[in-house]
UniProtKB/Swiss-Prot annotation:
Database matches in InterPro entries: PurM-like_C_dom, PurM-like_C_sf, PurM-like_N, PurM-like_N_sf, PurM_cligase
GO MF annotations, alphabetized: ATP binding; phosphoribosylamine-glycine ligase activity; phosphoribosylformylglycinamidine cyclo-ligase activity
Identification of the protein by name: Phosphoribosylformylglycinamidine cyclo-ligase
Subcellular location: Cytoplasm
Reaction catalyzed: 2-formamido-N(1)-(5-O-phospho-beta-D-ribosyl)acetamidine + ATP = 5-amino-1-(5-phospho-beta-D-ribosyl)imidazole + ADP + phosphate + H(+)
EC number, as in UniProt: 6.3.3.1
Keywords, alphabetical: ATP-binding, Cytoplasm, Ligase, Nucleotide-binding, Purine biosynthesis
Keyword Ligase: yes
Pathway recorded for this protein: Purine metabolism; IMP biosynthesis via de novo pathway; 5-amino-1-(5-phospho-D-ribosyl)imidazole from N(2)-formyl-N(1)-(5-phospho-D-ribosyl)glycinamide: step 2/2
GO CC terms in record: cytosol
UniProt source species: Nitrobacter winogradskyi (strain ATCC 25391 / DSM 10237 / CIP 104748 / NCIMB 11846 / Nb-255)
Pfam family for this entry, one: AIRS
Protein family per UniProt: Belongs to the AIR synthase family.
Amino acid sequence: MTDRNISLTYAGAGVDIDAGNRLVDLIKPMVRATARAGAEAEIGGFGGLFDLKAAGFADPVLVAANDGVGTKVKIAIETGIHDTIGIDLVAMSVNDLVVQGAEPLFFLDYFACGKLDPETAAAIVAGIAEGCREAGCALIGGETAEMPGLYKDGDYDLAGFAVGAAERGSLLPGRDIAAGDAVIGLASSGVHSNGYSLVRNIVEASGIALSAPAPFAPVATLGGALLTPTRLYVKSCLRAIRETGAVKGLAHITGGGFTDNIPRVLPEGLGVRIDLAGLTVLPVFKWLAQQGRVVEREMLRTFNCGIGMVAIVRRDAVQQVVDVLTQAGERVSLLGDVIVAGDEGRVVYDGQLDLAV
């Protein structure tokens, strides 16, 4: 029972305002480094500001997205590696913006924890700032919530919010997607940020410690390899859209894999035929499939399997688009074609994934 003669405090309840102020001081230079046309990227006010006119748009449509990184944060917590999970947070939202033809403009984050450690939180924000710089968007604000009793000490969760813009009339997917268009894939960097509940189950069943060498990448620890950041496709895809005029649609391959994500950008009545032999399956996916005895269908519905972004491209401009994407640093594969959807479903697979280790 609480002694009624004792004066209770917020700090005594587990919330340290001074730690929050120290965090703000630590991250101000990181945030400032994300400044871009339209935003000075200063924090400390009650709201973030963005000047849309200064960003150079004439008749813009705003596009918004928000996402998290799922249970990938648990691996960051267990390994103590916190400086890359913020990149994932940015990538998950801004990749969804570029799918609609939008240029990311600004980003806000939400960080919730049981007990605030300013240095850990600053490492996370450093990753967020790095992701924002790579995507060309400003980090204009965020929220840090210290919630003792809701989260255990050391645990945290993240959410991100991104806003972008596209000129009216240039939004994707285009209405001209048609049977015969080409389907190309942009390589992923790894598992990205989906499927980690299954990944963690497989790791636990394997008995391999996160600090041990990764069986599929011996130069890295298992935990470090699984924390490889989600690839950001923003600048390369925007370049392909603007320079070629031949990109009709984009699909960010997240939870649901090809099976659920590609149909989201296709007109009713159309599907795609994918040649699985055209996929370069990354070693991490081969290991997960073998170690977890995960069947091909489940792999394709859960993971990106080596392709993080799919583009629907005008057939006569495939090489032009591939050249632009390659020059922008992407590894590109020809995956298949847009087809008239039939009884087989909207995503038809030919061949098999190469899951042999």
